[in-house]
Amino acid sequence: MERTWRWFGKKDKITLDMLRQIGVEGIVTALHDVPNGEVWTQEQIRDLREYIEGYGMRWSVVESLPVSEAIKYAGADRDRLIDNYKTSLRNLALEGVKNVCYNFMPVLDWARTDLLHPNANGTSNLYFSHAQFAYFDICILKRPGAETSWPDDVLAEVEKLKATMTPEDDHNLVDTIIVKTQGFVSGNIKEGDEHPVELFRDLLSLYDGITADALRENMRYFLAAIMPVCDEMDIRMCVHPDDPPFQILGLPRIVTCDADIDWFLHAVDNPHNCLTFCAGSLSAGGHNDVVALARKYASRTSFVHLRSCHIFPNGDFTEAGHLGGRANLVELVRIFEKTDPTLPMRVDHGMTMLGDEARGYNAGYSFLGRMFALGQVQGIIATVDNELGLPYRQPGLF
């Protein structure tokens, strides 16, 4: 598998010089300074591609070319935004960048309630608490009817939190759920925005009355519109599963499980309509057999995220070490190496380790934690390649 790394552009505190020393072959990035919905010009793309290539690596995957909210909820501006999207795709392909990761999650790109949850060994990681998320939903966001979305045991925990949460705790929870995890990814709400809760409510209101079936139809419309460009330019569009893979905040989630993946692959049945196989997102749902999904969909996968989650008895989940958790990364690497040993892979997220926390890295995207994980995955790949009789590459040494 091609060893890639998510890099947030020239402003990233992790430099390309650092990455080429740790075995990274390809870069996963985007034009993060271009607002959602605007065209990525060929000149902008070329500038970034050449910058990456100047460090001996290639721009392997776009993550992400964001799908504007108005495309997802079928707003009046949808067709104009899709035309812009097609122009950006064409410009990417003209510069040789032809693997594009995206998602179709409304409003929230991914959700956690704690970005620095302590581990016994002194590291920290990402954590999702149903009770804390429900507290945000009911007591901070005050979403109408929110109480009906949560089971009685979670509501009982919310009552306990009401007695202990301070205004500072509330602020930190808001910052975690709708600012720190979103600003550097979707740009919907950013650091420094005033009244983020009110802005978030406004975004949620755009999806009033949008059912899962309606969102599916909007996804079908989008894919049908862009596939002719993908066919012409040989672009693989690989959708990212919903994170977490269950409904939150009353929003429909339509890429959460086997049936959902099967649906979108057949909704527009085209070899350029592909999957980003995110083992972490899928393993956060107890309903998913991650290895079985990999076996079933490896041939329609054009990008792999390797991480793993552990689910607690109450349904909360945390990022596990890359050798632990539910995902079984050893078997996943074996499946994907057999299918296509050139498939781009990145270690997704990583523990925050001693030396990471003070550096101001984006949530979940530490340097030392991901470097440690990449070393583990390199070992898995070397072992699997030896089993399969494949030559093992040592990137950057010879």
Predicted feature descriptions by range:
Residues 1-4, 9, 17-20, 70-74, ...:
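Histidine-acidic metal/acid-base catalytic patches
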Residues 9-32, 51-55, 91-100:
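Catalytic domains of carbohydrate-active enzymes, especially glycoside hydrolases
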Residues 12, 39-60:
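Glycine-rich, positively charged N-terminal anion/phosphate-binding segment
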Residues 21-22, 57-72:
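A short glycine/small-residue-enriched secondary-structure motif
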Residues 30-46, 249:
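Glycine-rich, proline-tolerant flexible connector loops at the mouths of alpha/beta enzymes
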Residues 33, 66, 106-107, 244, ...:
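Conserved beta-strand edge residues that scaffold enzyme active sites
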Residues 109-197, 256:
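Aromatic- and acidic-residue-enriched segments that line the glycan-binding/catalytic groove
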